[in-house]
């Protein structure tokens, strides 16, 4: 397990940096710049180590047509496009390698004799990192306070980690709320009470950011919780709080009481039109990873499926869409959604957290580029998916 966790640390190590911090190569006298630049190499190192292991062990690729498998095929196609068609080949190859790193790390774990405990550890590491990220922006959030304009704020991260916009910060807050609420409800340990103090700053930040994708995720996660766990006294208390947060932050502050403002795309349609034009110029292979930033004057696609298409063409977009569709078909057909409430600790808690998290990220994929490139969303998505698949494999549904 130790080496697998080390490898997962390498995958996370490249977050909030990139090859731009290596050009020009930082001076050895500027330790922070050197640290940021060298961190950019860590996900690529993780992918390289996993490939060396696969070749040495002659490992069989067991993901097949599962969600991790389809995402890997999408990443491989994007890597080929990066090599052949990208206007900035080195940058595109870097980001495609970084995208494949968590999938290759998960493959390494799945091939171990007992993968489930390692995947549990990955989920707990992810939870700890998201809590850290939320607390890291809390001083900025406290400085901004409440107001209708807070959704335009940019939150500065400590330690030279850069800046995060309100949508990204809202995502941190919602993930903390999901993990905290499920732990308080499903965990038998008294340590679950440690999550209670975190719910207050998480709810404060979620409402402050007025992030529509995060508020939508809160609604989706709430419905999924009722589906997998049923209505309980705790939910009857938390449900109205969630509804009030959505109404106040989303409808009253963000939309100013007008439903039309709530569904306004804030310029996304212009970016989508530019992206579609570029996709039309290379519909089969796309333009390689990071294509939106390279070809659209550093604009972001804000849609996972268009993001996949501009990077890996229409086939890549279909692979990505299939990965999401196959996931939810598997959750339903395998009975995981029905069997979660009967799972033994600690799996019940982690399964519910994973299902709710995947519901949020799936809903977010229509308005943000969730899991279509190397980023926080991808590193949350991959372990949650692999954990659910592995648990279902080790705990098959009883024959009717």
Model-found features: residue ranges?
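Hydrophobic, aromatic-rich transmembrane alpha-helices
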Residues: 1, 8, 43-60, 175-186, ...
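N-terminal signal-anchor transmembrane segment
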Residues: 1-57, 77-85, 136, 361-364, ...
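Long extracytoplasmic/lumenal interhelical loops at the membrane interface
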Residues: 25, 253-315, 331-342
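Hydrophobic transmembrane alpha-helices and their immediate junctions
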Residues: 59, 65, 191, 314-362, ...
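Aromatic-anchored transmembrane helix interface
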Residues: 67-79, 87-111, 121-134
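Alpha-helical transmembrane segments of multi-pass inner-membrane proteins
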Residues: 120-150, 164-228, 329-333
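A membrane-periplasm/extracellular boundary helix in multi-pass inner-membrane enzymes
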Residues: 135-143, 226-265, 273-281
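Transmembrane alpha-helices of multi-pass inner-membrane enzymes
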Residues: 236, 355-364, 369-400
């Amino acid at each position: 397990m130790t080496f697998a966790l080390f490898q997962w640390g390498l995958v996370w190590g490249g977050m909030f940096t990139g090859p731009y911090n290596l050009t020009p190569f930082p001076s050895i006298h500027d330790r922070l710049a050197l640290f940021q630049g060298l961190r950019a190499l860590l996900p690529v190192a993780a992918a390289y180590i996993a490939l060396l292991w696969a070749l040495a062990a002659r490992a069989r690729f067991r993901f097949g047509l599962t969600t991790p498998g389809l995402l890997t095929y999408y990443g491989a196609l994007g890597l080929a496009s990066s090599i052949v068609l990208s206007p900035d080949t080195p940058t595109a190859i870097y980001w495609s390698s970084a995208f494949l790193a968590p999938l290759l790390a998960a493959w390494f774990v799945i091939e171990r004799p007992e993968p489930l405990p390692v995947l549990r550890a990955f989920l707990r590491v992810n939870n700890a990192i998201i809590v850290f990220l939320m607390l890291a922006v809390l001083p900025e959030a406290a400085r901004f306070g409440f107001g209708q304009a807070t959704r335009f704020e940019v939150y500065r991260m400590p330690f030279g980690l850069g800046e995060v916009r309100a949508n990204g910060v809202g995502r941190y807050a919602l993930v903390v709320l999901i993990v905290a609420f499920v732990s308080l409800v499903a965990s038998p340990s008294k340590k679950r009470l440690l999550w209670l103090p975190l719910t207050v700053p998480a709810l404060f930040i979620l409402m402050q950011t007025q992030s529509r994708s995060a508020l939508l995720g809160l609604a989706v996660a709430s419905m999924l919780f009722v589906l997998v766990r049923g209505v309980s006294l705790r939910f009857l208390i938390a449900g109205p709080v969630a509804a009030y947060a959505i109404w106040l932050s989303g409808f009253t502050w963000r939309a100013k009481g007008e439903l039309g403002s709530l569904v306004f795309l804030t310029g996304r349609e212009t970016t989508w039109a530019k992206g579609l034009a570029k996709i039309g110029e290379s519909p089969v292979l796309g333009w390689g990873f990071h294509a939106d930033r390279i070809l659209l004057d550093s604009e972001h696609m804000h849609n996972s499926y268009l993001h996949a298409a501009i990077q890996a063409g229409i086939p890549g977009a279909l692979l990505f869409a299939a990965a999401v569709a196959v996931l939810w078909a598997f959750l339903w057909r395998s009975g995981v959604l029905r069997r979660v409430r009967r799972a033994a600790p600690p799996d019940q808690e982690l399964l519910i957290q994973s299902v709710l998290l995947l519901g949020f990220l799936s809903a977010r994929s229509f308005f943000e580029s969730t899991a279509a490139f190397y980023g926080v969303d991808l590193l949350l998505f991959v372990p949650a998916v692999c954990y659910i698949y592995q648990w279902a494999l080790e705990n098959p549904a009883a024959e009717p």
